[in-house]
Amino acid sequence: MNKPSSQPRAIYYVVALQIWEYFSFYGMRALLILYLTNQLKYDDNHAYALFSAYCSLVYVTPILGGYLADKVLGNRMAVMLGAFLMAVGHLVLGASEIAPTFLYLSLAIIVCGYGLFKSNISCLLGELYKPEDPRRDGGFSLLYAAGNIGSIVAPIACGYVQEEYSWAMGFALAAIGMIAGLIIFLCGNRHFAHTTGVNKAALHARTFVLPNWCWLLVLLVAAPLLITVLFWKEWSVYALIVATVIGLAVLTKIYRQAQTQKQRKELGLIVVLTFFSMLFWAFAQQGGSSISLYIDRFVNRTILGYEVPTAMFQSVNAFAVMLCGVVLAWLIKESMGGNRTVRIWGKFALGLGLMSAGFCILTVSARLSAAYGHSSMPLMILGLAVMGFAELFIDPVAMSQITRIEIPGVTGVLTGIYMLLSGAIANYLAGVIADQTSQSAFDASGAINYAINAYIDVFDQITWGALACVALVLLIWLYQSLKFRNRPLAVES
């Protein structure tokens, strides 16, 4: 039987857009916690609260974004609209020094754009393959790894521009990246003719007198304003609770929709994977908050007289993802038909194990800081690289399973639910964890002593927590191996 030897041409436009979206999103993210603490002079508690609220709501909106794509917009249009909104949000963020309202409004616009973009970019990629196409896993790993080109360059470029010019210029550069990606994507429109387009019948149908396109416009205006209020009043946790309840209700409905035992098993597998992904990302998302402030305060960042901007360290994680992801995609492709196929539970155990190893290295770094006043940069880079490598064994596996499910018309919503739990809930938990390192309640001397010990405790606890997750995953793997010893447990099954 002939096997396709190359990826669909359309994937390269999807990958290009993903690269620039990563550049835009992670360029801003690398600056945000530092902007809040160093420029706006927020205390650690306030900065962590706003940062985690933003990162949580970013992953709530994909549920609505997935629904709109499934029912009305189609994946391609949803992705383009989301990219446009994110570009606008980054531009508005540059004006946030003028008034706090601009800060909240800009974050709200980015949240809405991300909701339309993030879940549907994966679904758009899934449309390029048939369900059993052996190139699918390689395509998802390629998307995940190649997208990190943007997140490698972004912290370096945005961090440098911010350091040399201004915070506003750093955020503006992130916006330019998103606009560039959108233009490239539009140039490849002809390669997406076979994908799902806008549902014109649904768009022109009337609901409560008005056509649905009018309600869509109202939603695009009202949603950013509502989210702005949530940031301003610090009500985001309530929105998170409501979204979680709705998400679980939708998940229950999808389970009832399943018509075969195979579909129910596939859905059950996705639920378990999502749970472990949630724990993984609660640990990993320390990179943008507590780890970033730890580097800023306790790591010697000087090379040949030049002090490396803290934001640039965000590139280390992404570089590890890109480099190792290309190799992993090749290994999966080469082993697709044989006994060397990487098992799904083995991937998750390895990912969580690497996360534990990464935080173990950070614990050593923090102990050195406590002993000598600062830690070395190479040790920090090693820890971040190990944590970046770990990501390749989590999200690509889970996303590939979601897009393969045979229940019709639910991939967008399932992706949104996955983003809700592994993104929104995980980021909320990450904020709770990061807050344990806050030093705002102490004077300058006491804060330093308290903070370094707090970092040691938090990093050490995450090390052991991730190891406990590895043990649970290995137990599930062993159970599945014994139960289905005569059937392969390959990722594509």
Curated annotation (Swiss-Prot):
GO terms for biological process: protein transport. It is found in: Cell inner membrane. GO terms for molecular function: dipeptide transmembrane transporter activity; peptide:proton symporter activity. It is a multi-pass membrane protein. Its main location: membrane. PROSITE patterns: MFS (PS50850), PTR2_1 (PS01022), PTR2_2 (PS01023). Keywords: Cell inner membrane, Cell membrane, Membrane, Peptide transport, Protein transport, Transmembrane, Transmembrane helix, Transport. GO terms for cellular component: plasma membrane. The chain crosses the membrane at residues 14-34, 49-69, 91-111, 138-158, 167-187, 212-232, 235-255, 267-287, 312-332, 344-364, 379-399, 413-433, 458-478. InterPro entries: AA/pep_transptr_DtpD (IPR023777), Dipep/tripep_permease (IPR005279), MFS_dom (IPR020846), MFS_trans_sf (IPR036259), MFS_Transporters (IPR050171), POT_fam (IPR000109), PTR2_symporter_CS (IPR018456). Pfam families: PTR2 (PF00854). Probable proton-dependent permease that transports dipeptides. PANTHER family: PROTON-DEPENDENT OLIGOPEPTIDE FAMILY TRANSPORT PROTEIN, RESISTANCE PROTEIN MDTM, PUTATIVE-RELATED-RELATED. Belongs to the major facilitator superfamily. Proton-dependent oligopeptide transporter (POT/PTR) (TC 2.A.17) family. DtpD subfamily. This is Dipeptide permease D. It comes from Citrobacter koseri (strain ATCC BAA-895 / CDC 4225-83 / SGSC4696). The lineage of its organism: Bacteria, Pseudomonadati, Pseudomonadota, Gammaproteobacteria, Enterobacterales.
